[in-house]
Swiss-Prot record:
UniProt cross-references to Gene3D superfamilies, sorted A to Z: 1.10.286.20, DNA helicase RuvA subunit, C-terminal domain, Elongation factor Ts, dimerisation domain
SUPFAM superfamilies from the UniProt entry: Elongation factor Ts (EF-Ts), dimerisation domain, UBA-like
Any Gene Ontology CC annotation: cytoplasm
Membership in a protein family: Belongs to the EF-Ts family.
Principal subcellular localisation of the protein: cytoplasm
InterPro entries: EF-Ts_dimer_sf, Transl_elong_EFTs/EF1B, Transl_elong_EFTs/EF1B_dimer, Transl_elong_Ts_CS, UBA-like_sf
Protein name listed in UniProt: Elongation factor Ts
Biological role: Associates with the EF-Tu.GDP complex and induces the exchange of GDP to GTP. It remains bound to the aminoacyl-tRNA.EF-Tu.GTP complex up to the GTP hydrolysis stage on the ribosome.
Source species: Streptococcus suis (strain 05ZYH33)
Region (Involved in Mg(2+) ion dislocation from EF-Tu): 80-83
Signal peptide region: none
Amino acid sequence: MAEITAALVKELREKSGAGVMDAKKALVETDGDIEKAIELLREKGMAKAAKKADRVAAEGLTGVYVDGNVAAVVEVNAETDFVAKNAQFVELVNTTAKVIAEGKPADNEAALKLAMPSGETLEEAYVNATATIGEKISFRRFALVEKTDAQAFGAYQHNGGRIGVISVVDGGDETLAKQISMHIAAMKPTVLSYTELDEQFVKDELAQINHKIEQDNESRAMVNKPVLPLLKYGSKAQLTDEVIAAAEEAIKAELAAEGKPEKIWDKIIPGKMDRFLLDNTQVDQAYTLLAQVYIMDDSKTVEAYLNSVNASVVEFARFEVGEGIEKASNDFEAEVAATMAAALGK
């Protein structure tokens, strides 16, 4: 019988992603044959993989790949952050992004049928990864972004790959595009412009903002601070010409009541109108890229900065691992009880 050395176990683990004990057992059963051990691990793992199908996988990584004028960003999930750092897992994520960019599938169903370099389909690769790594590994989503020769991609990953961003910039180079992607990673916009926000969504978000103002006003009243006014608007989409005109007239009335000479109104009104727009577009600032203060130049919004350099953002995609996935939070006592019951064979 072949000697099962630590080096042999390590080699098998690196190739298969299996745990120490599983790798050692497989080598013992196959008399130290690495290839047979990998196949054995896979066979044993298939049954385990089926049992893991219903588990929640909310950790993982994003992958970003640029192929000429096509770029892909993908999210791949695992059950634990520890496995997300596994070399086999990282390679799977990066290969998936490459295959998606080159294959340009229409949806997840089509993506799962794409061929991996190993010859297996994407779907088969994930079943095998679940089997060998030992916990549920799942391909969650992807986005494809395309550009012209004259445009630039901004590819960026943040926080060890937990956030992946691709942006397309027209009229700028890759440096600007990457800076825009860095902003997107940090500030979490969901759409490019206020024109893409749903009307009811804006109303709901405005209600939440006003609720927070009301809570703050309760605290302010307790210490005799002046209360803050509730907001009527949350997005530029709600600021019609009539609303803007009415706001300007209200400012003029305020200046007249304060006794300010009319000859200096033209110097005061623009600043007050800017403040009105800032206060009444808070939903835009939270969710739309162009309305946000640019992290590279906080004296300007992203839109104002882009205008100053004659550039524009055409499109972007941002993935953050685990977005929208509800993680299981088991009661500790119940978990201990379940573990004891399993140990006792109940």
